[in-house]
Regions:
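Classical Sec-dependent N-terminal signal peptides that target proteins to the secretory pathway
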Residues: 1-26
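Residues at the start of alpha-helices and the adjacent loop-to-helix junctions
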Residues: 15-17, 70, 210
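Intrinsically disordered, low-complexity N-terminal regions enriched in serine/proline/glycine
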Residues: 36, 61-66, 85, 99, ...
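Active-site-flanking segments in enzyme catalytic domains
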Residues: 112-257
């Protein structure tokens, strides 16, 4: 009897321990807490996207999700998601990821896409937080579908340019602007947070683009990758078309197989 009670007690201890290992686990490659791999099965991923998801994994690109609210350092917060609630958005993202070559993500040191909701940086809502240092993009999967794709491509462009000096590239790009123009300098400080694509802003695809050269470039890239009629829509905006050529040429060099 004592032996049975002891065994039962040990089983309870093991169950509690295993639960706590998950609850307080840290994903070692990027040191993020409370995340795990998104299952590649037909409960979550549509039939037409299964092969794409598997191919991404074969090339060391993984989609993960937050199963518990997480706080990173003192300035990043993101809430858990119930993956079943975001099936449509998850599949939409996979379709967008298919636009990149099989070697692209390794070329920019991007291996982990972490999905969560209500992502905040310094208490301000943001679509994504990229970090090449840990090959990770934390991304808000709860965004409205109409801005989901462009937000993903915007953040991917930031990852394309991290950890290298692009001063000459930025200078060449900035020369397309009017000589008198100066970027605002602080995306989160400015009142120019309108991210609607607009073909009547001379040299820019959105008002938000006017904040920094990096945001300008990321917005152009996001527009190119998410719009099916970019050239037609911006045909009246010569400077935007010139910027597109610079950005797309830069992208093609990285996106080659």
């Amino acid at each position: 009897m004592i032996l049975k009670i002891t065994n039962l007690f040990l089983k309870i201890i093991i169950i509690i321990f295993c639960f706590n290992v998950k609850a307080f686990s840290v994903f070692q490659p990027n040191q993020l807490p409370f995340i795990e791999y998104l299952p590649i099965n037909r409960d979550i991923i549509n039939e037409e996207n299964i092969n794409t998801a598997l191919k991404l994994q074969e090339n060391r690109f993984y989609i993960l999700y937050s199963y518990q609210n997480m706080k990173i350092r003192d300035n990043i917060e993101c809430n858990e998601i119930k993956k079943e609630n975001y099936i449509e958005n998850i599949n939409y993202l996979i379709i967008e990821l298919k636009k990149y070559s099989s070697s692209f993500f390794n070329n920019i040191n991007f291996n982990y896409l972490v999905l969560c909701q209500s992502l905040k940086l310094n208490s301000i809502l943001t679509a994504g937080i990229p970090s090449n240092n840990v090959a990770t993009l934390i991304f808000d999967i709860s965004l409205n579908k109409d801005i989901l794709a462009r937000s993903l491509h915007h953040e991917i462009f930031h990852m394309m340019k991290q950890n290298k000096d692009y001063k000459s590239f930025n200078d060449k790009y900035s020369k397309i602007n009017d000589k008198e123009f100066e970027y605002g300098g602080c995306p989160l400080c400015s009142e120019s947070i309108d991210i609607s694509f607009n073909n009547n802003i001379d040299g820019f695809v959105t008002e938000y683009s006017k904040n920094t050269v990096e945001e300008d470039q990321a917005e152009v890239f996001a527009a190119v990758m998410s719009m099916t009629n970019f050239d037609i829509y911006f045909s009246n905006n010569k400077k935007v078309l010139l910027k597109k050529k610079i950005i797309y040429d830069f992208f093609k060099k990285i996106n080659k197989e």
